[in-house]
Amino acid sequence: MEVILLERVNKLGQMGEVVKVRDGYARNFLLKRGKALRATADNRAKYDGMKADLEARNLASKAEASKVAEKIQGKNIIVIRQASEAGQLFGSVNVRDIVVAFEADGISLARPQIQLDAPIKTIGKHTITVAVHPEVEVEITVTVARSQDEAERINRGEDISTRNEDRDAAAEAIAAAGEFFDPEAQHDDVEPAPAAEETEK
């Protein structure tokens, strides 16, 4: 289906462009959310008539979005999750979790604004793009950790995996030492040296 974009759409095109997309994507996203019109002769004429108004509204919303962008640019959001010693999460961190974390910090964002290709499944720092406006994007950091203390250590640049490896190595060393130590064992008695025979006088 060919559509006329009413705003810039990431990886698709700019306002006013006529692009060809899959029917399902057009119906369920672009048309439903008012981001495009079917590229019919009537709608082309309709777009020409509303172009100036669309551009004015776009400039106004872009200005507001820029203010939000200034507030969140470079922001570090901390999300606490349970994970294995190897740093693999028991679950994942998704778009909803990031939106909730922002809300806890007094910032309201919509899920479509968070550009996350796949759920986060590991401990560490992850860079995420937030599209506060079709023409305004910023990068933020999501630090996923098992505790607030661990999150602070990750943000200081400490190698959490090395700490875990050292702890595991120490545990293995203690276990290995236990295998060779028998607390019930007793030292063998040392036989006394035989007494020297008296020399016959």
Curated annotation (Swiss-Prot):
Q: Which Gene3D superfamilies match?
A: Ribosomal protein L9, C-terminal domain, Ribosomal protein L9, N-terminal domain
Tell me if Ribosomal protein is a UniProt keyword of this record.
Answer: yes
Segments forming a coiled coil = none
For region Disordered, the annotated ranges are 155-201
Q: What GO molecular functions are on record for this protein? A: rRNA binding; structural constituent of ribosome
**Where does it sit, as one GO cellular component term?**
cytosolic large ribosomal subunit
Which family does this protein fall into? Belongs to the bacterial ribosomal protein bL9 family.
Please explain the role this protein plays, according to its UniProt record.
Binds to the 23S rRNA.
Q: Which PANTHER family match?
A: 50S RIBOSOMAL PROTEIN L9 (PTHR21368)
Please state what the protein is called.
Large ribosomal subunit protein bL9
The record lists the organism as Bradyrhizobium diazoefficiens (strain JCM 10833 / BCRC 13528 / IAM 13628 / NBRC 14792 / USDA 110)
